[in-house]
């Protein structure tokens, strides 16, 4: 029991345990300034010449400024674990790529500046994790596409979205319509050509909308515009006012913009680009009575059309008006027609029935409508019984004969079939096409006049030889009834057909009708004994000239050898007697002395040729040397 009081006395003397020390901060990156003495922590690296995000960042930083550098890529690990970051600036770099999930750890981030970079698209995963983002600045990039789900994580918190100065032609308007807390929306200086009606109807807190310098020709009325007053000056606007800017667009001033003209604005410089009567005029100076539209007028429709069952049919309807009318089709049963498995409706007013059935016949109604009214036109379609299997793109009652090419038979199959039938049955029966003259390389083709066929545009001649399956086509004017074929191969058999190309008044389509076919053979080419070809002559001349040169060289060498032998093996002009002669004629001391006798020539064997020996005459007394 005495130990317990002793322990109680020693307990206050025990050293108190020290609290845990905070982790040492990371060193400040080179060329950066770090404010770590007071909260919040900041890392400032503007204009530091950085090529990438510094890896030694303090992960506790609340502000990171990396503007005016040369960063090209934002990687997943660059900003990892920076859960307390509130402000991130990457403005005016060379960023082309942002990795998916690069900002996924920045759940506290409120402002992200990516303006002045080289981004071309923004995908769904690149902004993932920014659940508290309020300011997103993407201006001055090269954005051409914005994914529909790119803003999903920040749709409920985003207050400021700047997409200006990009290359956007389309926007995910439904995704933008979900930004219920956005106050400022910058869409200026893009390539937007249209805005769907009701695109801003759910943006109840929108205070400024900038759509200047786009390609908008009209702005549809929106419930947002009717609820809030429109003022041009943002400074003097009340808190609930909406500032709308749409200058620099090619506005088409018609009745669709009357709602905008009725709003009092004084300091915007919008102008009309069309119609021509109002082009260039100040938008707010044009009276309301001049914003007019023209009702549609149907200018063209298909005539009554008759097609066999199973064939396609095209119904056409053209209309004009201001604004451009929209064309719709109604079936004989009163149903509105659109794109389906059996029909296709085109924006130009054409309705194409891919496969007609007997029940499709009746009166089709074309309806052209715009803001000023609508116009209708009726087009009758008759669907007859299906054609015989042999018919192919022809309204003639005579089916094509076996082996005769038509519009639906491939050329190779047609020629092969024709050749096979010809081998069995001989030449085909003439159907009006005559080959009146033919030689080795040419043939004159004639056919009867086809005036009974209305609307003939031209004739088509197609032929091929027995050694070639490729068809050759010739287009002949409708006024002609003959044609001279040239460049044919000699000694070959040709299959030839003539077709009339005309416009079928019943269908309004271009059709073909066979005029006739024929088979002929070109004459074999003769082999005349003419002059040799130029290449042969050239080779012969070269060989002859070379032979002459070689013979001349041989003769020259032979002459030199003969002269060498004649002079006893010495070059011409240098004989044995030449040495004494030269010594005699030499002058040493200015006086002439007696010349010694020349040495006797050495005996030599007799030669068959003449030997020339030169001797000098003896000097007389008068030639004695002179005294001193």
UniProtKB/Swiss-Prot annotation:
UniProt-annotated glycosylation sites, renumbered to this chain: 348, 393
Main location: membrane
Region described as Disordered: 380-433, 570-609
Disulfide-bond pairs as recorded: 317-366
Extracellular side: 17-540
Record flagged with keyword Flavoprotein: no
Name of protein: Leucine-rich repeat and fibronectin type-III domain-containing protein 3
């Amino acid at each position: 029991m005495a130990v317990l009081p002793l322990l109680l006395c020693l307990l206050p003397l025990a050293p108190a345990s020290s609290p845990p020390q905070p982790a040492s901060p990371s060193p400040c990156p080179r060329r950066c300034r770090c404010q770590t003495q007071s909260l919040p922590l900041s890392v400032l690296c503007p204009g530091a010449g950085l090529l990438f995000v510094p890896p030694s960042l303090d992960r506790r930083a609340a502000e990171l400024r990396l503007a005016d550098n040369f960063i090209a890529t934002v990687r997943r690990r660059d900003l990892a674990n920076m859960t307390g970051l509130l402000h991130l600036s990457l403005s005016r770099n060379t960023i082309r790529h942002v990795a998916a999930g690069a900002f996924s750890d920045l759940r506290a981030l409120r402002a992200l500046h990516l303006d002045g970079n080289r981004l071309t698209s923004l995908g769904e995963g690149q902004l993932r994790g920014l659940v508290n983002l309020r300011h997103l600045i993407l201006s001055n990039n090269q954005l051409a596409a914005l994914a529909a789900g790119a803003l999903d994580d920040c749709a409920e918190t985003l207050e400021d979205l700047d997409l200006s100065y990009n290359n956007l032609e389309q926007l995910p308007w439904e995704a933008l319509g979900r930004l219920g807390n956005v106050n400022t929306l910058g869409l200026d200086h893009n390539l937007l050509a249209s805005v769907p009606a009701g695109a801003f109807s759910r943006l109840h807190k929108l205070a400024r909308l900038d759509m200047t310098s786009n390609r908008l020709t009209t702005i549809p009325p929106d419930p947002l515009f009717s609820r809030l007053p429109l003022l041009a000056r943002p400074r003097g606007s009340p808190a609930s006012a909406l500032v709308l800017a749409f200058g620099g667009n090619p506005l088409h001033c018609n009745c669709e913009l009357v709602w905008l003209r009725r709003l009092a604005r004084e300091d915007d410089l919008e102008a009309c680009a069309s119609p021509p009567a109002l082009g260039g005029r100040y938008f707010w100076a044009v009276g309301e009575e001049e914003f007019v539209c023209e009702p549609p007028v149907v200018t063209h429709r298909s005539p009554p059309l008759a097609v066999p069952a199973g064939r396609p049919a095209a119904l056409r309807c053209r209309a004009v008006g201001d604004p451009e009318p929209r064309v719709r089709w109604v079936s004989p049963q009163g149903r509105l027609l659109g794109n389906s498995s059996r029909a296709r409706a085109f924006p130009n007013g054409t309705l194409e029935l891919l496969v007609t059935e007997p029940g499709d016949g009746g009166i089709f109604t074309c309806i052209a409508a715009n803001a000023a009214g609508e116009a209708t036109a009726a087009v009758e379609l008759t669907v007859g019984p299906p054609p015989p299997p042999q018919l192919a793109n022809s309204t003639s009652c005579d089916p094509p004969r076996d082996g005769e090419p038509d519009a639906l038979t491939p050329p190779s199959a047609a020629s092969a079939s024709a050749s096979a039938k010809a081998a069995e049955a001989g030449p085909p029966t003439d159907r009006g096409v005559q080959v009146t003259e033919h030689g080795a390389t040419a043939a004159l083709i004639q056919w009867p006049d086809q005036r009974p066929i209305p609307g003939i545009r031209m004739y088509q001649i197609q032929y091929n030889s027995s050694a070639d399956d490729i068809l050759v086509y010739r287009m002949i004017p409708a006024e002609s009834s003959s044609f001279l074929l040239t460049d044919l191969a000699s000694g070959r058999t040709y299959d030839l057909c003539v077709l009339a190309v005309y416009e079928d008044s019943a269908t309004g389509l271009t059709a073909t009708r066979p005029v006739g076919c024929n088979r002929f053979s070109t004459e074999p080419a003769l082999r005349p004994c003419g002059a040799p070809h130029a290449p042969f002559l050239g080779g012969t001349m070269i060989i002859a000239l070379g032979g002459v040169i070689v013979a001349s060289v041989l003769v020259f060498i032979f002459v030199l050898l003969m002269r060498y032998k004649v002079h006893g093996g010495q070059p011409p002009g240098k004989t044995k007697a030449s040495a004494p002669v030269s010594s005699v004629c030499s002058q040493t001391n200015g006086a002439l002395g007696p010349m010694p006798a020349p040495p006797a020539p050495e005996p030599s064997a007799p030669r068959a040729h003449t030997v020339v020996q030169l001797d000098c005459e003896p000097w007389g007394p008068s030639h004695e040397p002179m005294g001193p």
